Amino acid sequence: MAFLKSEGLHQFGELSDGGYGANAGVTWMPSTTGNVGLRFDFSYTVYGSESTPTCLTTPCWIEGDLVTRNNIFQVGIGPEWTMSNGPIQPYLYATAGPSSFFTTLEARHCGRRVYDDCSETNPDTYQSDWGLAWNAGGGLRYHFSEFFGLDLSYTYQHHGVRDYLVEGDLALNDDGTITIDNLRHSRANSLVFQIGLNINVPQWG
């Protein structure tokens, strides 16, 4: 499991503020002595969000926020080459699979006291664009014990030309309607830095 920080490239980078999210994956090594395995990745990135104060009831007895989030979901599979079998393991990998750019809207209400919890409704999706993406990157694992290690990586994500929204593109109108003011259409590629925990599961037999 890893935390990720992304920076968009070209027009996508100029329109968005960068993103943050999480990545989970597993690499299957068919041989205990081999250096080539099969990598599976699942990643989720939020590349923009905004909150709009609103009344959650009529009359306005309960106030809250409408939260807009711009997201990327991606699944990838491909080869991984580990260059060393010692405690320090540099590696290279490439994956390909489906990815989606989608924008959601949900209502959020928080209590007035500091220790009150916040509640959110299930998000509604107002725009989505599925397509094929591929990643190419490399990293370094440092195993500080037999089972656990630190994983650092840097990746180029290629999504190609996509339709997507950025902050301010989804309009919340005074009459209660929701419209898309500006649907963006451009290349939407990114550079991604990840830091996380690596768990090593030994092979028996």
What residues fall within each predicted segment?
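Residues on the lipid-exposed face of transmembrane beta-strands in outer-membrane beta-barrel proteins
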Residues: 22-28, 42-44, 75-81, 94-98, ...
